[in-house]
Amino acid sequence: MKVSAFIQSHITEGAQDMLKSEYLQHVYTQVVTRDPDQREFHQAVLEVLESLDLIVDQHPEYEKHGIIETFVEPERMISFRVPWVDDNGQVHVNRGYRIQFSSAIGPYKGGLRFHPTVNLSILKFL
């Protein structure tokens, strides 16, 4: 998905204001460019990157091995339909999700989400 030059410059300026590390600014820009409509997820990523800002420059191996890029992209995003019948016999179909970020240290954490108001951005935020 192509992002306009205006949006791209706005993303970069916002990240520069919040993040000292050029590497983390680059990672954040990639996240926003890849999923420009997922504002809740952008907020969560920015908060995590801010907490890493002080240590990432002390550990150049993080950038060398793409550690932060791995953290901000889920391993799997599963979407499925959930048909159900209400008390009046009316059939409804909701969309269900499961987002799985990392299995590096064992089984995935989290559960399935079915609520009609959730979307990928909110689930990745969680």
Task: Show which residues each predicted segment covers.
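N-terminal ligand-binding/catalytic initiation module
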Residues: 6, 17-126
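Short, Lys/Arg-enriched N-terminal segments with co-localized hydrophobic residues
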Residues: 1-17
